[in-house]
Structures are given as C-alpha cells and as structure tokens.
Regions:
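A glycine-rich dinucleotide-binding beta-alpha-beta segment and adjacent secondary-structure elements
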Residues: 46, 64-65, 104-107, 280-365, ...
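A short, glycine/Asx- and small/polar-enriched loop/turn
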Residues: 56-61, 109-116
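Conserved redox-cofactor binding core of oxidoreductases
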Residues: 1-103, 312, 319-324, 333
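Alpha-helix N-cap/helix-initiation motif
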Residues: 78, 132, 159, 277, ...
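FAD cofactor-binding and catalytic pocket of flavoenzymes
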Residues: 39, 163-286, 325-330, 350, ...
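Active-site rim elements
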Residues: 17-23, 72-75, 270-279, 366, ...
C-alpha cells in the first residue's frame, strides 16, 4: 500500500506509516497540487494498492499505464483480492475455487442456529457444500439477496434477519465524474494520484459535510463514447479527453432504511433507492469549479489555462446512476444490539452461529471515500478472529 502518513487532514490514528511511499504525481497533477496548496488547501497523495517500484522500474510489476482505473490489470500489479488472496490461496491443496457457480441458498440445521448446507448450481448442476464456517462475501446487494432467499421456518423473513434490517440501509455514495477542459493538453498517463479532503466536513459557507475530491483514471475518447450522443464525432471526444482533467467527486450516502434490497415474486433482486445528501454534493462540485478558476496562469496562453478550449470555463460531467454499484455497502450492518443489527462486532450473524459476512454489507455509514481499503482491513480483522475461533 502506497501513501504518505499525515498528509490527509481527515486521517485517523495510524499504528505506523504506509509500507510504501506514495505514488508520485506526474507534472500536470503536481502543478494542480501546488495550486491547491497555494490556495491554503492540504492536497494529499491518494493511497493506492499497486505493486509499483519507482526507484527500479525493471523490478516493478506496475508500469503506470492509463488503464489502471476501471480495468482488470493484465500484469497482475494491483493489490486486489485476486492477486493478494485468491491466487496465493489456490497454491494450497485444501483450497478449491468453483467458477460458474451460483449459490442458490443457505440451509440451516433443524434448530436454525447453524448452516448445514450451501446449495450451489455449478454449470447447471445442483451441488451441496458444507463446512464448519460459512462466509458470505458477495457484495452488499447479493449478500442481502442470498440471506433473503434463504428464508425458512426458523428464519421466516430471511436468514439472520430477526432484526428486519437485512437488505436495508443500502448505500452506494453520491458520485460524479467532472471533466475540466483546458486549452493546454493534459499529457498525464497515471492520473489517479491526488486527493483533497478539505471540504469533507464542510466549508465556511456550508457547515455540513460535502465530501471528497479525487481523480478517475485518465479518460480517452473511446471511454467517453459510451455516454456521448450517437452522432458525436470521434475526433471531438478524443480532443476533449486530451485536454481534460478528470475528477471523481464523492459525497456520503446516508443510511436510509427505505433504501433497500428486496426480492420480487420470482426471486429477482429489486433495489429501491431514493437519493439523499444532494445539496452537499452540488456544493462540492461548485467548490471544485471555484478552485479551478484560481489556477496558476498558464505560461503558454498568458491567462488561466482553464478558460477552456472555447475561451470560457467548460466542464463536462455526470452523476453516477444507481447502476453504478461499485461502492455498495450497508445492507447487513453490524452492531451490539441484535434488534438493530444483523451482525455482531466480529461480523458473525447474531442469529446463526457459523455465518459471517465479510464484504461491504457490515458498514453502518458509508463515509465519503472508496470503501475498498476498509473492506480489506475488516476482512483481515475478521480473519484473525476466525483463526482464533478454529484453534
């Protein structure tokens, strides 16, 4: 994990520094970081899980390519679950990975206190699997759906759902992508290295939380084509991408019990959601635009380069729709009270002695940053608990 301890003004206590120093900024991103700092902000290097060795490029698995964000890594250089956990685990003879397998339901013993069988369809063939411990890591939507599908006479509203909260409190963040177009091209390849949290808890004008500013991976014309009008010329999209800084803005999505996962009469997943915290997000976007108008004057054009390709401030952006579920959390929340939570502090179901949920479902609130590192850290924590339990 790359990062610099103490840069993020919202950083909580850490037991020690990051294992690797932060990924460096490319020149255009460094210039923007310097501009933000000049304005009194505290920009910081985005913590990144990549296998990068900047001191010795020949020894580096990561090559700082433009497809790091949003694409599988073809050289296995992301510190993701596959590279760090699944692939090493498969080196052991007692680990089996079943592909094309769909877990239909979890069946309990007659007492309802433990899971007896995991019912799987594997390439159309029904199978039963059993184990002393069952861990669901399907993601907040599919874990909730699995528990609801697994209702029985002991768990009439869904497995582990005596509290009635399984599927509720779905959160996926209030997210937007904003392209800031400028006269000067942006030659950056590895763009996702800078973040700003100065408005995480609000601003002088707005005393409520606003959120987090960072970057997406560098956009290109082909990526933009998916959201552009059908008749948009390809060269226009290419030109826009070559002259853009591509921001990702995240605001906290509040835990509304009516934002929830349910099943329809055929067992299909229904995601019901009403957006919230929209005013804070709008103000975050406006604040970023205000900051961009105060950039250092361009040495080439003699004025704010960000006046845009068409001699005016120009932004292109969109809110991420409900289908953008990458940050899904909250549907099987943990807590000490079985009446208001489905999991205990170790992410074990209150109602089922051998069921654990270790994905984003356990979150009680979403925060306003990518939940991936928190999910990973919690998985390691629960793993230590399981080792102790199985001794």
């Amino acid at each position: 994990m790359h990062g610099n301890q103490g840069e993020d003004p919202t950083e909580p206590h850490r037991s020690g520094p990051y294992t690797h120093t932060a990924v460096s900024h490319e020149p255009r991103i460094q210039q923007l970081s310097d501009d933000f700092a000049r304005l009194g902000l505290r920009p910081f290097h985005t913590p990144l899980g990549v296998m990068l060795n900047e001191k010795d490029s020949h020894a580096s698995r990561c090559i700082r390519c433009e497809t790091c964000d949003g694409f599988p890594c073809l050289v296995g250089a992301k510190s993701d679950a596959q590279v760090c956990a699944v692939d090493p685990a498969l080196q052991h003879s007692n680990v089996t990975l079943k592909t094309n397998a769909y877990v239909e339901r979890l069946e309990t013993s007659s007492s309802g206190r433990e899971i007896d069988k995991v019912i799987i369809k594997n390439n159309g063939i029904r199978e039963e699997v059993s184990g002393n411990i069952v861990v669901s890591s399907c993601g907040a939507i599919n874990t909730a759906a699995l528990l609801l599908r697994s209702a029985n006479d002991k768990h009439s509203t869904g497995l582990g759902n005596s509290s009635g909260i399984v599927g509720r409190h779905y959160m996926g963040h209030v997210n937007s992508v904003l392209m800031a177009l400028s006269k000067c091209p942006n030659p950056t390849i590895f763009q996702k290295s800078l973040s700003v949290n100065d408005f995480y808890f609000g601003s002088e004008e707005w005393t409520y939380p606003m959120g987090h500013i960072s970057f997406v991976g560098k956009l290109d014309g082909e990526t933009l084509k998916g959201g552009a009008p059908a008749l948009t010329p390809g060269w226009t999209l290419d030109l826009m991408a070559q002259h853009s800084l591509d921001f990702w803005l995240t605001s906290e999505d509040l835990p509304d019990p009516n934002n929830r996962v349910t099943l329809d009469s055929n067992g299909g997943i229904v995601l019901s959601y009403k957006p919230n915290n929209e005013e804070g997000h709008k103000r975050l976007i406006a604040k970023l635009k205000e900051l961009m108008r105060q950039q250092t004057k361009c040495r080439i054009h003699g004025h704010e380069c960000h006046e845009g390709l068409f001699a005016r401030n120009l932004y292109v952006g969109q809110r991420i729709p409900l289908a953008g579920v990458a940050h899904q959390v909250g549907t099987v929340r943990f807590g000490n009270d079985p009446q208001t939570s489905a999991l205990d502090a170790n992410c074990k179901a209150h109602d089922v002695d051998n069921l654990y949920v270790v994905d984003g479902s356990f979150f009680c609130s979403s925060g306003a940053v990518n939940p991936a590192l928190t999910i990973m850290a919690n998985a390691l924590r629960v793993g230590e608990h399981l080792i102790s339990r199985m001794k």
